[in-house]
Amino acid sequence: MEQLTTLPRPGDPGAMEPWALPTWHSWTPGRGGEPSSAAPSIADTPPAALQLQELRSEESSKPKGDGSSRPVGGTDPEGAEACLPSLGQQASSSGPACQRPEDEEVEAFLKAKLNMSFGDRPNLELLRALGELRQRCAILKEENQMLRKSSFPETEEKVRRLKRKNAELAVIAKRLEERARKLQETNLRVVSAPLPRPGTSLELCRKALARQRARDLSETASALLAKDKQIAALQRECRELQARLTLVGKEGPQWLHVRDFDRLLRESQREVLRLQRQIALRNQRETLPLPPSWPPGPALQARAGAPAPGAPGEATPQEDADNLPVILGEPEKEQRVQQLESELSKKRKKCESLEQEARKKQRRCEELELQLRQAQNENARLVEENSRLSGRATEKEQVEWENAELRGQLLGVTQERDSALRKSQGLQSKLESLEQVLKHMREVAQRRQQLEVEHEQARLSLREKQEEVRRLQQAQAEAQREHEGAVQLLESTLDSMQARVRELEEQCRSQTEQFSLLAQELQAFRLHPGPLDLLTSALDCGSLGDCPPPPCCCSIPQPCRGSGPKDLDLPPGSPGRCTPKSSEPAPATLTGVPRRTAKKAESLSNSSHSESIHNSPKSCPTPEVDTASEVEELEADSVSLLPAAPEGSRGGARIQVFLARYSYNPFEGPNENPEAELPLTAGEYIYIYGNMDEDGFFEGELMDGRRGLVPSNFVERVSDDDLLTSLPPELADLSHSSGPELSFLSVGGGGSSSGGQSSVGRSQPRPEEEDAGDELSLSPSPEGLGEPPAVPYPRRLVVLKQLAHSVVLAWEPPPEQVELHGFHICVNGELRQALGPGAPPKAVLENLDLWAGPLHISVQALTSRGSSDPLRCCLAVGARAGVVPSQLRVHRLTATSAEITWVPGNSNLAHAIYLNGEECPPASPSTYWATFCHLRPGTPYQAQVEAQLPPQGPWEPGWERLEQRAATLQFTTLPAGPPDAPLDVQIEPGPSPGILIISWLPVTIDAAGTSNGVRVTGYAIYADGQKIMEVASPTAGSVLVELSQLQLLQVCREVVVRTMSPHGESADSIPAPITPALAPASLPARVSCPSPHPSPEARAPLASASPGPGDPSSPLQHPAPLGTQEPPGAPPASPSREMAKGSHEDPPAPCSQEEAGAAVLGTSEERTASTSTLGEKDPGPAAPSLAKQEAEWTAGEACPASSSTQGARAQQAPNTEMCQGGDPGSGLRPRAEKEDTAELGVHLVNSLVDHGRNSDLSDIQEEEEEEEEEEEEELGSRTCSFQKQVAGNSIRENGAKSQPDPFCETDSDEEILEQILELPLQQFCSKKLFSIPEEEEEEEEDEEEEKSGAGCSSRDPGPPEPALLGLGCDSGQPRRPGQCPLSPESSRAGDCLEDMPGLVGGSSRRRGGGSPEKPPSRRRPPDPREHCSRLLSNNGPQASGRLGPTRERGGLPVIEGPRTGLEASGRGRLGPSRRCSRGRALEPGLASCLSPKCLEISIEYDSEDEQEAGSGGISITSSCYPGDGEAWGTATVGRPRGPPKANSGPKPYPRLPAWEKGEPERRGRSATGRAKEPLSRATETGEARGQDGSGRRGPQKRGVRVLRPSTAELVPARSPSETLAYQHLPVRIFVALFDYDPVSMSPNPDAGEEELPFREGQILKVFGDKDADGFYQGEGGGRTGYIPCNMVAEVAVDSPAGRQQLLQRGYLSPDILLEGSGNGPFVYSTAHTTGPPPKPRRSKKAESEGPAQPCPGPPKLVPSADLKAPHSMVAAFDYNPQESSPNMDVEAELPFRAGDVITVFGGMDDDGFYYGELNGQRGLVPSNFLEGPGPEAGGLDREPRTPQAESQRTRRRRVQC
């Protein structure tokens, strides 16, 4: 039965019953309606089959019987595979054996039937049935054989494979068993061993066992899977066999049905079993005797055949069975059958039991396998844990060993430490005793030295004071004489100048006639070219008289048509080169050729003088100048002609030079058309045409010729003075030009020369242009470097015809609408032909040597703007001429950029630019330069310029043969670093005595902050090679040298500044000499007056030009007569002023008022005006004639001149005023008066050298500040101040528009000014662009206010002005720093005034930013970030004398910008406080706003030491912009110098009205970081500070008296609306720490009525807590009122009785106050009663301190020698700068310990630091860490300081990054 398939393994799902076999597919349908998946089944008759097998196994001894006798269930351990071969063998063996015996049996039955005569019928029937069965069996056997032959080999092969796999699995199982055994043995050993502590080894073992178990399981699973796959494959084959068998069955006999076949099969099986039984019985009865009737043959044969070993297994039984019925009887047969059946049943039972046992064993085997796996896993885990525990045990042993070793070491170290401690204690005790002795000795020695020095100082101060009184008397008398002389001189000068005007007008007319004749001749020459070319050239350049050909560089625009050749600097052989050198191309293009009207005639008529003027600076370094009278005449001539400028033929847009402050990429911006805008690079110069449009954009042009829109907030105007001051010396003589020339250069009706200076200024970046004699010295970028207004040039120059020696040219005229005066045709730079106006654009050039080589032909257009660039329209002709560019060279090379230029072979072609093979943007036609940016330092590059032919093919003859069209150039960028050195280093007197201002022009940095490829970090200042200071700001422009550094500078000769970077410092800048005038000027008791007499060379340019306000030759950039109100659109006309060098080089000498006035023009204005020009920004079309202004000024002057020159200068500076006694004259204030009458309190001028860096917002603060001071001076019965003359631009009376303050001019952003003024409360803005950090902006603004010029009285606080001395000096008059150092006497005199009721009681004038005085036009809205308000009160030491009644202008309840306490609202002498206010403009308070580049002054106090040293109590607190997280800082205040208990206390905070509290309060941080003290609310909010409830600004008092520095904060401004309803609140006891008089000390307007006065030590009763403004409601002396919280301290009383006793006592002695807490029945609590003071911060920016403090008594002289007096002080706390100092330069500070005696030199500086010495080392010492007698020890006004007061004083410094 080959069709049988293997059964599933026992226990598997789907396992079949042990007896069930697969059914036949063809006969029996499978369960579920689908064909059965098994072979034909004989499950219905399993017993018969089993009996047959059993019988056969019993009867046969062959091994195959064993296999067949097994149950079909497949309980064989080998699996079901073993069953198949057994069954197959059984079928194969039984099949053939059954056929022959059955045939024989049939025959035997037939024979028996015959013999027995049919006696046994049942047997016959059986035999018959048996025969049928045999036949059927034979048929089935044949079919089985056929099936076996077809499928058995394949099945047998698979079975063999499965057996092999079984064997392999068995081997694997044996291996696993062996491994498990080994693991168990190992596990037993591990378990028996002592278990260490669990450790990492156990985990490792577990992991290893887990990995091994996973591998084993994966192997077993893969094996089982493979076996299952094989079983599945066999099952599929069986199904296929079933299908085949089905087909075969269908082809079998049709009569055999399935059921019949099954039934017959069962019957046959039963019959076979029965026959087998019979055979078995026959075999058992073999030994029985046979009947005689039986033939012996068959029986013998049966018996013989039965045991035959080789016979088939069933042959003998079959024969016996055939004979059995004959031998046995029927009963026996039945008995035998029963016996066989019973045996069969037994066998069946036994088989079933065996099957059950097999199943049990199989299950047992599976369980054992599972246990084996579990045991293996457990073993692996145990092994892993064992290894981990072993590792832990090892580690434990190691740790225990190390612990033991460490214990031993610890014991030894402990013993050593104990011994060292004992030694240290002993040494410490000895050291302390020695320190006490040393301390005592030092104190004695220092005290002796101090007394000696004080004695010497007193003698010196007395001598100086006597000398000063004498000088003042002399100066007053001399000023009177000079005033009278000046008036006479001015009158005579006016007459002479008017005569000169008439003469010049006549000359002008004659020149006009001559010019017309020359023009006719020129037209004739033009019609006859050729041999007449040279004559034409001579006529053009010489006969016309306007422009004699200069032999050298001429960068002045030529005012004639023939001036073109001189305008461009070209190499020989290049087109357009007409002169050997020309520094810059045609500055005439700035404003066009001079007017062809009276202007031209005028310049022509004055030919002799004009020729000398037109000579280049190199050709005439010392131009002849007529006498002073002639100078005045020329000035008058220019004055009379200048107003006609706007109406003339100057059609070009006004041009201005701007500097890009930041980089700008239009495509990253928000605008819709970025292509219309220009990309900017920081530090790049831009030429601006016209005014700003409504969107805040200018129309500008870059130096490379690109034009477009320029955002106004990214650029900053370059003042004309900056341009001229940056020129080489030989170029500075450009101001020698006559009036017509300068009007030609000027950009506005006022004659500002920004245009000309722009061209000049651009010459400096290209110094190589003048040195390139054989190379191309290009004119700058088109319309950018040399031609700012872009002179239109011809286009498309072509050769119409070329002959042997001549060419015919044609071109297109300039497409722009411009007045053409003709064309110049040049060959190799030589003028060959000139065409007049109206001539056709064609020319014939003859006598050309075309075969000698290429000739460069260029065509220039002569327009009303000047001559065009010859390289814009040029062509190469002749032999070897091509389109390849020539003379390719590097024009400008830096570390990160390079500019190349070339001479185009044909200007009609565009040129492709390649850098290192990479294509760059091409150069358009008529462009001959390219700039490469963002290069790498020190990197070689190869630049290639290739002429691009037109795409449509050659359009010139011969171009198809061109081979070379490119020129190549190799260059290497400069190595990175060091950075460039700063420029224009200058030293000036500082804002207060003892301070110098060192200023410089910062290096230009790009957007990344780098210069020359390295990042700029700051600047270092060196004095004679020794570094004295560093400024950590890359944009710093000045620094104040403090007292300690000043001592070094007094012996130095020069100062240099270096730029710092991570790659080192730059080279030294040009040294700035320390003139003898500076050192005395910086001392408080000395007055030095540089001689005001300029040399004739210095005065010559002054008289020879009529510059505009921006011209450096203008003495005052903003002057306007006191009564002159200029129309809003008119730029302020400024008369000439001296060149910068005029007075700088003058030696110091005593001088008269007139001389001093001239010196003011030469020095003060020279710096202040040159760096902060005001009028040049006003784009008004016209200005009142200078002649008219001159008349007005002359009428307003009363100063006679001592000489014609001085008179001329006085006339040129009519805005200045003379101070003579108490006369309110409006003349020039002489320098002598400034310096000699020091007590007049004139504000010092702080020239701002780095003005170019600053933004254009400061003119607001300066204008308003000046205006404010003017009105104060007016109301104080003072003389007309310089402020009021400056107020020609700034006074806003009668509603007239005031012009920007010239000294505060912020270049050309006047529009910004006015727009800012439109904003409410934004009157005071800094000059900084506010995209830089606010701290830096504030610092820069400080410096700017120190240096930006005299126009801002609040910015340049001078010494206190004694209004009652009869000297008519106005404190508003600006002064140069140091020109008028304050003498102590004068300062005291001014100080005393503030205590006078008439002066103190007055209400301050109020003027608001919302006043209609400011024109609300032409101002771009400022960036909110750009408004940094400087809350500087004008109460600086120099402003102290500004007293007297003040009024509110126009009665308008206007709001002033943020101010400090005294300016905000009241009489308090508060130090200027700097605040960054949101949306607010800066208020300039003090020129002492320190150098922005240095550190910002955050000193929240001053000390009495400083006060007495003459460095008044002005302190500046800066806080950041409100949004930056910093609160609005509080201004600290200096302590006044007065008798003890008089004015020695700090002033209270200014409190704000309630309406100001709408903005959330920003509690500023004092330097100590204590937030519990309220800030100055006047400076915290974004609203106006210091205004009372009605919106008016509180009275502003300029008193010298400032708050005590230790207060650290201002008195908060009180809200008047608050009531006194505090009686119900709990009562607290406070003690007054300082004297307080609200009337004189409080900034609040109603202080005398609502605030409570008290004395130091007075007991005060306080109700409740302080209000939001920092005021308590209290009671004292029988009065109730407000008490400032920062001037009192609470007293902690133990009992109510003690409190009552204290109230009755009403006073505490100073000793108790000094003792602090714990020494009495009560203690008073203040901030920081114990512990060291806060970390001191130093600010390197020196604040301007008042030279003296007010004192009710006679002033006390503080000589300069006192600054150096040594003193002894004791350290109260330990101080280590490395740990405790917040400052960056900790190496400059001294470390010390508590108890150290430190020798202090001089007074405390503005940062709160002394310069001291300890143990031979010198450095800075924080004053709040010291105690004991200071420099002012012994002074009556010294206020005892408590530790609490000390702890409140801190220093704060912010370094700009």
Swiss-Prot record:
Q: Function of this protein? A: Required for synaptic transmission regulation. It probably controls the recruitement of voltage-gated calcium channels to the presynaptic membrane, and modulates neurotransmitter release.
Assembly notes: Interacts with RIMS1 and RIMS2. Interacts with TSPO. Interacts with CACNA1A.
> Which disease does the UniProt record connect it to?
Dystonia 22, adult-onset: A form of dystonia, a disorder defined by the presence of sustained involuntary muscle contraction, often leading to abnormal postures. DYT22AO is an autosomal recessive form characterized by focal dystonia or tremor and mild cognitive impairment.
Query: Mind telling me which GO cellular component terms the entry cites?
Result: calyx of Held; cytoplasm; cytosol; glutamatergic synapse; mitochondrion
Q: Where is the composition biased (Pro residues)?
A: 289-298
Q: Which UniProt keywords apply?
A: Cytoplasm, Disease variant, Dystonia, Intellectual disability, Mitochondrion, Repeat, SH3 domain
Ranges of residues in domain SH3: 653-720, 1625-1693, 1764-1831
Q: This chain belongs to which protein, by name?
A: Peripheral-type benzodiazepine receptor-associated protein 1
Q: Which gene encodes it?
A: TSPOAP1
SUPFAM superfamilies, per this entry?
Fibronectin type III, SH3-domain
Q: Where is the composition biased (Acidic residues)?
A: 1259-1274, 1333-1346
Domains as described in the record: The SH3 and proline-rich domain is required for the interaction with TSPO and the second SH3 domain mediates binding to a proline-rich motif in RIMS1 and RIMS2.
Which residue ranges have biased composition labelled Basic and acidic residues?
A: 55-67, 1138-1147, 1420-1429, 1554-1586
Question: Which cell locations does it reside in?
Answer: Cytoplasm; Mitochondrion
User: Low complexity composition bias: which ranges?
Assistant: 299-316, 603-616, 755-764, 1098-1116
Q: In which tissues is it expressed?
A: Predominantly expressed in brain, pituitary gland and thymus in adults. In adult brain, highest expression found in temporal lobe and the putamen, followed by amygdala, caudate nucleus, cerebral cortex, occipital and frontal lobe. A high expression level is also observed in fetal tissues like brain, heart, kidney and thymus.
Q: Which GO terms describe its biological process?
A: regulation of neurotransmitter secretion
Protein family (similarity comment): Belongs to the RIMBP family.
Annotated region (Disordered) at 1-103, 284-321, 565-629, 729-789, 1083-1311, 1330-1479, 1501-1601, 1723-1761, 1823-1857
